[in-house]
């Protein structure tokens, strides 16, 4: 598996991404960073790194899924969707801050993970059609 992560958008979330990258690499997975300090070059590198259906974006709080123009291609779809990259979105903040994106997910195959059990319960109550992990 190949994993794309994002850094330098939000300091703490970049740190979390770096820690995840280390673990993914220890597990034998290839990793690639989209760097907000060098967006043009690192976004260009996605197409060279990604293998359709074998690559995932692992992001936090909809970074890279919030309508950023750099990730939207000419056909109006996200690069993730066009390149067959699955999206794992880890919500660190409460889901209520992302109502518009949860009500109408930016990509069809997005998996949402919450770090708080109360957030999972909230998701199941207000967005029952959207799969959320962990599923307690």
Role assignments for model-derived ranges:
Residues 1-4:
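Extreme N-terminal starter segment of soluble prokaryotic enzymes
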Residues 8-11:
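Short polar catalytic/cofactor-binding loops
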Residues 13-126:
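Extended catalytic core of nucleotide-activated donor transferases of GT-like folds
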Residues 122-136:
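Helix-loop-beta element that forms the nucleotide-linked donor phosphate-binding surface
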């Amino acid at each position: 598996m190949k994993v794309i992560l994002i850094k330098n958008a939000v300091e703490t979330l970049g740190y979390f991404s770096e820690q995840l990258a280390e673990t993914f690499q220890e597990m034998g997975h290839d990793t690639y960073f989209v760097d907000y300090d060098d967006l043009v070059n690192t976004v260009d590198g996605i197409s060279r790194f990604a293998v359709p259906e074998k690559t995932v974006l692992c992001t936090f709080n909809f970074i890279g899924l919030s309508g950023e123009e750099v990730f939207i291609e000419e056909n109006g779809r996200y690069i993730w969707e066009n390149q067959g990259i699955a999206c794992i979105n880890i919500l660190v903040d409460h889901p209520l801050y992302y109502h518009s994106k949860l009500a109408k997910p930016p990509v069809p195959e997005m998996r949402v993970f919450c770090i708080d059990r109360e957030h999972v319960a909230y998701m199941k109550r207000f967005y029952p059609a959207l799969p959320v992990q962990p599923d307690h």
